[in-house]
Amino acid sequence: MYPVLVDISAKIQKSRQSLEPLPRGETLKAGKPLKTLFLNPPSFEKFDGGASSRWPATREIESYWYPVWLTYPAGMLEGSRLVDAPPHHISWHEVIALLKDYEFLVLFTSTVGWDGDQGMAELIKETYPAIKIAFVGPPVSTSPDRALNECTALDFICRREFDFSIIEYANGKPLNEILGISYKDSNGIIQHNPDRAQISPEQLDEMPWATEIYHRDLDVTKYSVPFLLQPFVSLYTTRGCPAQCTFCLWPQTFSGHAWRKRSTDDVAAEMKQAKELFPQVKEFFFDDDTFNIQKARTIELCEKLKPLGLTWSCNSRVTTDYDTLKAMKEAGCRLLIVGFESGDPQILKNIKK
């Protein structure tokens, strides 16, 4: 075990000894969804590796990405709250205190944070025996059996896209009827419900805007990335990526390879509102796996972004042509993030780049 994980385990044990069980909040009225806390959990000091972090790392300059995947179900549940602990320097003690007012915890776990996250889930369950706990994120998508066997505090885990699985549970649907989840039944036997169909383009347009939840629950001045203007806001206009690169996180553990796009009208409307909500923001970042993979759609979106006078950047393909680049530049694009993984043809072949 890494030394830093040992340190987190020690802190958990200390918390077990010092925390007294806190009283539960009042039960919600009939017909209301479970009062839900969405959590990107506390992590190692200055480590950006939790919810939605594409490049987990501890950097010389403290920096964090937004927990965008948690914003969509958070925006669909009345009374919910999104807590992004690392950039806001919220401790586990503070998280546990917050949970006294909630009935359901949705925690976005990561491979590097797994040991600490499962230990804290067990402590939370000891403190609030009635609370329901679901884990989402890469390690539970790839190894659901291991997750459920190692962490006895879990009520269930979600595999891959979890937006509607979480909503259905919070609104009272029985576990055995919810697609895309795994759980232990009353006999302790792990049950894997059938996979949930990927969210459709039409559903993407109907979902809440991530930037609205940022404005509701987060302090955007806490977020910074060295290569972007500060403060910045990141969001997605698509899900999925048709490329088969073996090293990429989200297509393989969350969004899959089917490329689905929001309408350009929906994206432009969100950006117009975001500019009004965040006058202090210097730059927007489209964190799509490959923002400009479809020329016609990229140019159409740029035509709608151009009147807004935004500064923005994105992930890009090296094969982007001149016409597309010109449209992007005229619409306010400042920077392209392009992957140069190797100069060795065999390595590129091996990683399916």
Label each PLM-derived region with a short phrase.
Residues 2-270:
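Acidic, low-complexity intrinsically disordered segments
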Residues 210-353:
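Radical SAM [4Fe-4S] cluster-binding motif and immediate context
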